Amino acid sequence: VEAIRLGAYEFIEKPFSKEKILNYVNRALESFNLKKEKDIIENKLFHSFELIGKSPEIIKVKKIIEKLSATDSRVLISGPTGSGKELVARKIHKNSSRYKEPFIIINSALLKEKTYEKELFGEEFEDGQISFGALERANKGTLLIDEVSEIPFQTQANVLRVLIDQKFKRLNGSKDISVNIRLISSTSKNLNELVKNNQFREDLFHRLNVMPIELNSLTTRTEDIPLLIDYFKGKLSEINGVQQPEIDIQNDNLYTYNWPG
């Protein structure tokens, strides 16, 4: 178990056969290749996908991104799931002076309370091993805290302290770690309501909400749907090396569907 925690793919109990070893090796290679392929695809998506649309809302968002890219201000992006919050955050990073540095995402909604601080701050172990958290991995770059409303309430005070001091300690660590990051947060919930209900710290909210961006569902800007269809047909065809699919943009279902996620 300790070996796997430190990075081993699998352990084999004695006695073992040649076939079993080959099977584990093949599975490890397959896992490695899948991760490599995933990284390549994500890198292509990061550098190729654009914020598509001609609606007044998208034009406004593009202008805001242009302004924010020239600053290091914290940004809070609000909007329903699937409205493009991560894409906006990536565009701000890509157009900023930090574009050559890491863009790290930590999704608060996917983490349990006990593991959140470990994922954010990292952890030190008695044997000297270090598990680096999102803050350190994002140093000099941009950290996106996705679904920031889901940060455990007890952890919110520690996040606030990092924003004030620009330093933190790893779990089980005694040394202060200084970081230089741009923080972007996103949420699909109303943080003002959570503050009123004492579910989110008001002081942290104001620290995060320096430059707010509001995004709406695609259902409120249906004039962008034909452009998005055209764009994604071309991009996905290019990435996957397949012929562009035929899609009838006159189909009413495209404009009445609520496009969740």
Predicted regions and their residues:
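Nucleotide-binding/hydrolysis machinery
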Residues: E19, N23-L29, K54-E57, A70, ...
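Conserved phosphate-coupling serine/threonine residues in phosphotransfer and NTP-handling enzymes
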Residues: V1, T81, T187
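Conserved post-Walker A coupling segment in P-loop NTPases
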Residues: E13-F16, I64-D127, E136-P152, S217-T222
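Flexible nucleotide-interacting loop at or near the entrance of a catalytic core
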Residues: K18-P80
